[in-house]
From Swiss-Prot:
Ranges where the record places region Disordered: 230-251, 367-386, 803-846, 863-882, 930-973
Residue ranges annotated for the Helicase C-terminal domain, each copy included: 629-789
Name this polypeptide is given: DNA repair protein rhp26
Species per Swiss-Prot/TrEMBL record: Schizosaccharomyces pombe (strain 972 / ATCC 24843) (Fission yeast)
PROSITE patterns, A to Z: HELICASE_ATP_BIND_1 (PS51192), HELICASE_CTER (PS51194)
Biased composition (Basic and acidic residues): 238-251
SMART domains: DEXDc, HELICc
């Protein structure tokens, strides 16, 4: 029995999420193209009106110049005015020609950002995207035409950029070797090296090296084992190389039986590690080495689940093996991930001494004060806010212990791991010292330039700074600037200069009333910005580099409100609080929060009262439509042998979910949220992955959805959607990642017709806008024009299906106002052919229209007809994550809809277009020069108190308005 059939009695409507989102985004693209065309028509009318006005002025001036009554001195003045008007006319006619070309040219392949690239550049970006070369490599010396299906062609194309590798062809493929190397057993389907056989050998994997005895025991065992293998190999070779290795430390010697890979500069990936890395991971290690040689930093923005942690561990281990690990490395990460980092270092390269500066560390004195400081070091969201919660400082005794711990890292090596909160608490111990390397895991936490943690991180004294983030660009250009200002100080100039020269021109170019010069200037500035950051931002996607991952499917389950939920929802919409919100007397977010609680469970609204009410069944599952679905799903999956991750946004909802799970027969669960002791979090994760006793793992999205590896589950449920699509994406990627052996199914639950469905619509569109390529018309401003009032509506209970479901199922759906609609609501008619084709709609019924989509102006929906499944994902990937993905992110994060179509090759006779192009290029080059003049050398180590790069140390003189910039552009013209 399928899930859909099993839940049919609950009124659940299921839609495949991938197809749904593709259908919605395709419709949005059509709408945006239509809106862009309308804007161009209005722009053309405006230009033609101005041309007519200027021509009329020229005609009048000609008449007055030709008149016998006009004095000679006055005629000279008129001729000067006439010359200016003719120049203006020439510029306006140039704009008119550009606009007409854009209107006539509907071939997206001619849009800027596609045709602007040469074949060589496209091939280079394809190699970078698929993890075969680094961004610093060009195609000189590579084969210009590579058949990527041919193994020998791949080897021929990448061999000159990847260094010397002593193994044979299988290691140049996009997959790791399936050869049995003796130490780490693998089968053909294994995709992740950290298998149980390895972790069982490393008995101290979960214990860091704050206790020096632990480190010594592990190091001695590793050296003895390696030396024994070397002696065996030397004996078989008649002691051929035995004298060569005498007197050297074991970690500096090559592996006895497995070959490493050496790059230019004496950097070698040891044989202990290299055979177990994927092709794209080796490329990342090479890229990190290239950054290290430049004394620059970068952002590893690989998609979640591709092993960003492994790539850093491999690089630092290779530095140590190559004898280039001169100063200790600092790793800052969320508290939940500290033990994971320790485990990976111990598994991949035992000689590295890894110390945790945290109350959960294994130092002899840390345990005495563990309870006292766990609350101080908890990973709250305060780091992302502008006003951080003031953390309580460490006691004098613990501070002395921390000081000795940091000192030991500098005297005995090698890695210090702490949290973002710990960086602030122990800043006086960490910030004054010079570090060899610094890594910020989940580095998007410092995206706010004014936050305290961002300021602290920028004071770390090292030039080798790396950010790990699966979602490096989320909202706007200021956040992008702040991330780059950490990894490469001065690369994008100071914040005021960056906003002046890049952010404002790019933003203005996206306005509907932007002139032709402003549109092209925005494009040129964005191209310049892309070129500045692309070598230092490495982002690869699973679909491009990890094709052997199990399948992942996503379903959206639309659940009906229970009668109690619907009554509570309607009562709030008709209540006094709602009127205050609509009148602006109360915060709109208050109403949103109440409605979201009702959608989850009505008891959450008055939780404090009902929780202590006598004889009241708090959290009764029968009161929540989604909770009834959860219980049915988990019962079914228990029978089928599936294990589930169940995510919710709040701990209060987890409490109710826990109540609903307790009376389910034979369903065992564990739980982790913000209140879970940090010392227990990794143990909970490991226990769930290894122990199949637990069927369900209850998690909050913020704690359990951040960097945690939960491949023990193959089902994921997102109980309630988040405004930020990257938050839900982080959660759903916990199971679908390297190491997963089963197909993964993700279910989103939402109540039909409520605020949750509208939040989901905004998620789809926000993700759609983030993934747009430059060729698409201006999209974001259209959606920004909608207000939040449409959130406070409720779909008709009698309607079968949902607003989103209708969008997906209808072959065409026209939104229009129906004067005879019930209750005065706006409605839509479902075409008769749809009612016949889809049984979900009853004859004669009308479905409530979405005010969201009507305000957005979506006129119709085309039914999505999926092609062959094997080609769907790849084709979509190529279109949305193609060669201009970095430029795409820049425009999306700036709040731009997109640029307009332009002819990329101008004819020589079109002098007006050449002038516009020249002016746009000049403005972009001026922006580049301005940024470069404020860039400080990356080699310079700035003490914390002298750093001019820290946000807040130099404030902008004042905001520059749009009118000011428009005036400047007018003067330039």
């Amino acid at each position: 029995m399928s899930v859909n059939e099993d839940l049919s009695h609950l009124g659940v409507f299921s839609v495949d999420q991938e197809n749904l989102e593709r259908d919605v985004t395709n419709t949005a693209s059509e709408y945006i193209a239509h809106e862009s065309r309308e804007i161009e028509k209005k722009r053309l009318q405006k230009v033609r009106k101005e041309i007519s006005s200027v021509k009329e002025k020229i005609r009048r001036l000609d008449e007055r110049i030709d008149s016998r009554l006009t004095k000679i001195s006055v005629k000279e003045n008129f001729r000067k005015q006439l010359s200016k008007f003719r120049d203006t006319l020439q510029s306006l006619q140039s704009d008119e020609n550009d606009i007409k070309r854009r209107l006539n040219n509907e071939d997206s392949a001619n849009a800027p950002g596609i045709g602007a690239f040469s074949t060589e550049e496209l091939e280079r970006q394809e190699l970078i995207r698929t993890g075969k070369v680094t961004p610093f490599r060009n195609l000189s010396g590579l084969q210009k035409e590579v058949d990527f299906d041919d193994e020998s062609s791949i080897r021929e194309a990448v061999i000159k950029s990847e260094g010397t590798y002593y193994e044979t062809a299988p290691h140049l493929s996009s997959e790791p070797s399936n050869i049995d190397h003796g130490i780490i057993p693998r089968d053909e389907k294994d995709e992740y090296v950290t298998v149980d056989a390895v972790t069982e050998k490393v008995v101290t994997a979960a214990i860091d090296d704050g206790d020096d005895l632990v480190y010594r025991q592990r190091l001695n065992a590793w050296c003895a084992n390696r030396k024994e293998l070397r002696d065996q190999a030397s004996a078989s070779e008649n002691n051929k190389d035995r004298g060569e290795f005498e007197g050297k430390d074991e970690w500096l010697l090559p592996h006895p039986s497995k070959k490493g890979q050496t790059f230019e500069g004496g950097f070698t990936i040891p044989g202990d590690i290299r055979p177990h890395l994927f092709r794209y991971q080796v490329t990342c290690v090479q890229w990190l080495w290239e950054l290290y040689c430049q004394e620059a930093g970068g952002i590893i923005g690989d998609e979640m689940g591709l092993g960003k942690t492994i790539q850093i561990v491999s690089f630092l281990s290779s530095l140590h093996h190559s004898g280039k690990f001169q100063k200790p490395a600092l790793i800052v990460c969320p508290a939940t991930l500290m033990k994971q980092w320790v485990n990976e270092f111990h598994t991949w390269w035992a000689p590295l001494r890894v110390v945790v500066l945290h109350a959960t560390g294994s130092g002899q004195r840390a345990s005495r004060e563990k309870r006292q400081y766990e609350s101080d070091a908890s990973e709250s969201e305060a780091e992302e806010s502008k006003t951080s919660i003031k953390l309580r400082g460490a006691s004098s005794s613990f501070h002395r212990y921390a000081k000795n711990l940091v000192e030991s890292v500098f005297t005995r090596g090698h890695i210090l791991i702490t949290t973002y909160a710990g960086l602030r608490i122990y800043g006086d111990l960490i910030l004054p010292r010079e570090w060899g390397y610094c890594v910020l895991d989940e580095g998007h936490k410092i995206r706010n330039p004014d936050s305290e943690i961002s300021i602290s991180c920028k004071q770390i004294r090292t030039v080798n700074r790396i950010i790990l983030s699966g979602t490096p660009i989320q909202n706007n250009l200021t956040e992008l600037w702040n991330l780059f200002d950490f990894v490469f100080p001065g690369r994008l100039g100071t914040l005021p200069v960056f906003q002046n020269q890049f952010a404002l021109p790019i933003n203005i170019g996206g306005y509907a009333n932007a002139s032709n010069v402003q549109v092209q200037t925005a494009y040129k500035c964005a191209c310049m910005l892309r070129d500045l950051i692309s070598p230092y931002l490495l982002r690869r996607m699973k679909l491009d580099v990890a094709a052997d991952l199990p399948k992942k499917s996503e379903q959206v389950l639309f659940c009906k409100l229970t009668p109690l939920q619907r009554k509570a929802y309607q009562d709030f919409l008709q209540g006094s609080d709602m009127q205050k919100i609509l009148n602006g007397k109360r915060q709109m977010l208050y109403g949103i929060d109440i409605l979201r609680k009702i959608c989850n469970h009505p008891d959450l609204v008055t939780r404090e009262y009902l929780l202590h009410k006598e004889d009241y069944n708090y959290g009764d599952p029968e009161k929540s439509g989604k909770l009834k679905v959860i219980r049915a799903l988990l019962t079914l999956w228990k029978k089928q042998g599936h294990r589930t991750l169940l995510f919710s946004q709040t701990r209060q909802m987890l409490d109710i979910l826990e109540i609903g799970l307790k009376d389910l027969p034979d369903v065992h669960y564990c739980r982790m949220d913000g209140s879970t002791s940090i010392a227990l979090r990794q143990d909970l994760v490991d226990n769930f992955n290894k122990n199949e006793y637990f069927d369900v793992f209850l998690l909050t999205t913020r704690v359990g959805g951040l960097g945690v590896n939960l491949t023990g589950a193959d089902r994921v449920i997102l109980f309630d959607p988040d405004w930020n699509p990257s938050t839900d994406a982080q959660a759903r990627e916990r199971a679908w990642r390297l190491g997963q052996k089963k197909d993964v199914v993700v279910y989103r639950l939402m109540t039909a017709g409520t605020i949750e469905e509208k939040i989901y619509h905004r998620q789809i569109f926000k993700q759609f806008l983030t993934n747009k390529i430059l060729k698409d018309p201006k999209q974001r401003r259209f959606f920004k024009m909608t207000d939040l009032h449409d959130l406070f509506t409720l779909g008709d209970n009698k309607t079968e299906g949902t607003e989103t479901g209708s969008m997906f199922l209808g072959s065409e759906r026209v939104l229009r106002k129906d004067n005879s609609s019930r209750n005065g609501n706006e409605a839509e008619d479902i075409p008769a052919r749809d009612r016949k084709k889809h049984k979900i709609h009853d004859k004669g019924k009308k479905v409530n229209s979405s005010k969201v989509f009507e305000k957005m102006g979506i006129a119709s929906m085309e039914k999505y007809k999926p092609p062959q499944e094997s080609n769907v994902t790849k084709t979509n990937s190529d279109s949305t994550l193609g060669d201009d993905s970095v430029l795409d992110d820049i425009f999306a994060s700036a709040g731009i809809q997109s640029t307009l179509k332009h002819d990329d090759i101008m004819e020589a006779s079109q002098t007006e277009s050449i002038l516009v192009e020249k002016e746009a290029t000049r403005v972009a080059n001026e922006a580049l020069r301005a940024v470069s003049s404020f860039r400080r050398p990356p080699r310079q180590l700035i003490p914390p108190q002298q750093s001019t790069n820290v946000p807040g140390t130099s404030k902008p003189s004042g905001p520059i308005t749009s009118s000011t910039l428009l005036a400047r552009l007018k003067q330039r013209r």
